[in-house]
Amino acid sequence: MSVPATNLVTINVDGRDYQVPVGMNLIDALELFGLEIPHYCYHPKLTVAGNCRMCLVETGMPMKDRQTNQIIIEPDGRMKIGWGPKPAVACTTNCTPGLHVRTNTQVVKDCREGVMEFLLINHPLDCPICDQAGECKLQEFATDYGRGYSRFVEEKNVKPKRTLLGPRVMLDDERCILCSRCVRFCDEIVKDPVLGFIDRGSYSTLTCYPGRELDNNYSLNTVDICPVGALTSTDFRFKMRVWFLKPAPSICTESSVGVNTEVWSREGKIYRVTPRDNNAVNDCWMSDSGRELYKSVESPLRIDFFAVDNGKCAADKALARATELLKGGSVGYIGSAQSSLEEQFLLWLLVKTEAGPVSFVNHPGKGDGLLISNDATPNLRGAFLTGLLKELPKTNIDDLRRKVESGAIKTLFVVHEDLAALGFSDDLLRRTQVIYLGTHANLTSDYAQVVLPGLTVFEKTGSFVNQQWRVQRFFQVVPGPAGTAPDIQVLGQLLARVSGNTSTAPTPEAIWQQLVASLAPLSGWSWESIGMQGRVLDASAWVHVPFPEGKSKHFDPAAVTAVKAG
Amino acid sequence: MNLSAKTTQYIDNLLPRYPQKQSAMLMVLHAIQEDQGFLSKEAIEWTAQKLEVGPMAVYEVVTFYPMFRQAPIGRRHVKVCRTLSCALRGAYKVCDSLQHELGCGLGETSADGNYTIEFVECVAACGSAPVVMVDDKLHENITPEKAPDFAAKIKKETTPLLPPSRH
Amino acid sequence: MPVSERRIIYRHIDEPGYTLDLACYQRHGGYEVLRKAIQRKPEELVQEVKDSGLKGRGGAGFPTGVKWGFLDRKSGKPVYLICNADESEPGTYKDRQIIYKDPHQLIEGTVLSAYAIQAKLAFIYIRGEMFGGFKILEQAIEEARAANFVGNNILGSGYSVDIIVHRGAGCYICGEETGLIESLEGKRAYPRIKPPYFPAVLGLYQCPTIVNNVETLCQVKHVLDMGGKEFAKIGVAGDSGTHIWGISGHVTKPGYYEIESGKATVRDLLYDFGGGPPVGRTIKAIIPGGVSMKILRMGEKFKVKLPDGSPAEWAVLDIPLDSNSFAQCGTSLGTSGMIFMDDTTDMVEALANLNAFYAHESCGQCTPCREGSLWLKKITARVCSGGGRMEDIDLIKNIADQVAGRTICAHGEAVAWPCQSNVPKFRDEWEGKIRAQIHAREHPDGATDHARTGLRLV
């Protein structure tokens, strides 16, 4: 995150001047420059608690002459600084002009060593069995700022261990440092005040009201923000040490909110999904239901083969048969709002080459006003942008089905949808020539003449357009099953064969060169220019479309009427 | 919730006096505890509804403040101050003596259900140390020498016919 | 010449025939100050309090007029006055006498102060253990309301204020002003971080709030009665008025004595008022102001500056009873509850007693106090039960140093100061005791209980 250019003031930290936004929290301000003030309880998205006392630093302000109200200047030209008699917590300090901070004095070192020692005296020796190891703030700060040895020889406090706080969250009270981040999160972000501290003093214990659980759909965020291993994910428990995991940036496909995610994998297997920071979309949160979606990658229903007439075959044969069917005319298309923008673009090129009616299916979601919207697909707007859609899709495809029944349409190119669920009878399904591109088997793929394997969002690279008309990129985390290829390659090859144009564009960057040239709102863009926080496009062309989403965090449908290009 | 009409009336009169309902928390809990002898789970949830807060907010408070208890105690609540001024004048000896005389362990309820003996922290009567509170009354100058007589007095007052302690 | 009390606040405490009812209070001139003051401008009353130099009597000794001046008047939010009647500092019992024996003085002081700061509503937060006091105060308020001294349109002035008596439930930390505010809001008594939650700006319900001790509010009545400048003449410069000294511990006549600030010494308090130590014993140590203040060892000498600037040296008994004098001796007057310990006292056990208190009362919000207080308790308990090590002596002091000044509220200092003063000043006792314990552990045959000398304190 770079320093915003407006309203800067000068503060001095350890003898050096820094320009920071006025009023900004000191911890956040120093992070802009890569300077760390160690802290536990402070979190930029929650109210300030100030209880861990790890962020104690020395602060001072220039002293003013009582009579003249002028700043006193020392003989060497520097301002005379009145340092506070006690260290102050940085988390309640806002940057004001002239603020002086010292973080490298003996006093601050003593404070940090002291707090570290206090935090560790009742802490259990759980590192070998604690999931937090490797990303634990106690470990990190003990190494960086701790004394390195313990003086505690008394009996440690005993508290409940490994209790199920909720269906997805495990609580180990002995590890808890009582920072109250989880309590504040449930109170302030989710508005479900189910967590709290009972008892008093060093016996204070985090718990849920007896009989209730931490079961809201954002409970796993408490695991993310817990600085220690007190709150851990039951799904991830004991599965993998975090230092073996590689994170890759992705986008949650649960809904059109387009929550930014981090997907962690090792050797081709995904172990967990966590939120990725994006202050314009999801802050640093995501839903529990969104995290589960990675489990669809390893499913017995995965389509990891090419097939013609129910027989697995080489890609070449399947593509050839599909080309044949498409060239046969009377084609209808069913696109998917699960597809990436690049895939939808290639589909549009295909439609232009071999024309036919295009349908999408509306998948309504249950918006919760937070990070799940009323649209359960990540990229409906991509379909509008590419021109595949002019109006909102319905939940049925009756029009298209009638055309198939009447014989006006003989071949259907179906992406990711199940015709059986859309009212196609078994009989009709058998009679129709279907080319199916998708990730998981269903009745449609069972009956399809040609089956082309698709990849999940975790196995390919591309972009989605979310409810804010923000284009956001996702990157491949794990390779797809052996023998498969990203959808854009499959579609690209199909397009090449159908159009006779042999040149294909197998990478997102290359497709973007075409996208930018064809679609006016993307004029001047590039794949790189989207950045890692996404980029909003000019959506004035679709201002009249009554999209179904209501309010979410960082999204108000009423404000969309004046969307500017990013 | 089997609160007496008097208690319910008291709480209903009390709530509107406070600018915010949650403020009345301690007073409501005191009233319920005096009525029922302790604060049950039902009482906690009743209070939560009455004050329009989540039950966790009430539960947090009940476990924080030592005067609130979640289980019944003996008929007579004997509280011996253990902080410095009283300790300097023999509070620990007084407590031992009372435990012996009343047949009750420290922090426990006696087998006959008549007494509960606890240490408490300074009750702000240091000039007449050692002090002992029994139910809601303060008893001053209960020295180790006087402790056996004091215990006898408590026992005499606590005949089985006396209604259960309500404090 | 023996010093005598100057009973201003305590004029009628224990007076034969003085009863709690309004009629008695009025016979003795009660509510006359209110009658006159409520016709004056509130700002004038605040100025009187500023002129008086009155310092708060709750332990921190902050100038009351200055505190009132911090109130945020710009936001337009209602102002609240809270009387801190949560007297819980061990060794202190002065407010109890006022509440139980002269409640109307407190009521009048509360209404006067509420009027001066233009409070919308006043609370008296009384500790839960004072069952009787609660009833007495409620009764007194009802009497006052019936006579138009509390409630609507007081004495026809147009000013209205009600007083709600609110009971605590057994927490020392509710005596901390922001802890009290949280408790009054119906929550766990977690003190607030300052900045930004200064009560005068963001107090009760995030509105400007003043929290004053019981005795302070009573002192306000007398300030307004005689005028601020006259009040300032009582006592000494920098500490005007009287202090109510409650003495306890090893003295012949424990009790409460109202003494003009600076006009008597510790010696006077011990001998003239307290009747001296128990027969056959000598005083070894005193804690001047409630147990949170640093302990003084008899035999210590302090190099000080007298009010005229000249240097002097005081023994403990020489210290005048005013805040500046105690400050010069490295401790504090605090709540003026002096505890005397004689030569039979095991100083290690005394500290263990206090550490157990602070560990029990720590609210648990911030790391140093929460963990440090319990750790200190465990160490001193271990030493008292015979398991002491020589390194524990420095360890205790070191842990206390890690707590003081690093916490959200002053409970950190309260945890630390007894350790930081007891251990260095009585090091010989600690070393002797622990050495004996080590010896007993190494020679388990026939060794007597070397854990404790004197009375059991923990």
Question: What are these regions, as identified by a protein language model?
Answer:
Chain A
Residues M24-D28, S340, P486:
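Short, structural beta-strand-to-alpha-helix junction motif
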Residues L26-G60:
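A basic, amphipathic helix-loop patch mediating RNA/tRNA/ribosome contacts
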Residues R53-I251, V257-T261, K269:
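Fe-S ferredoxin-like electron-transfer domains
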Residues V153, K161, W264-S330, I372, ...:
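Cofactor-/ligand-binding subdomain signature composed of acidic, glycine-rich
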Residues N217-P275, H416-D418, S425-N442, V477-G492:
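Phosphate/diphosphate-binding loops
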Residues G332-E343, D418-A420:
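Gly/Ser/Thr-rich loops at beta-strand to alpha-helix junctions
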Residues Q344, L350-S526, I530:
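Non-catalytic alpha/beta scaffold blocks inside enzyme catalytic domains
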Residues W512-G566:
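Long, low-complexity segments enriched in small/aliphatic residues
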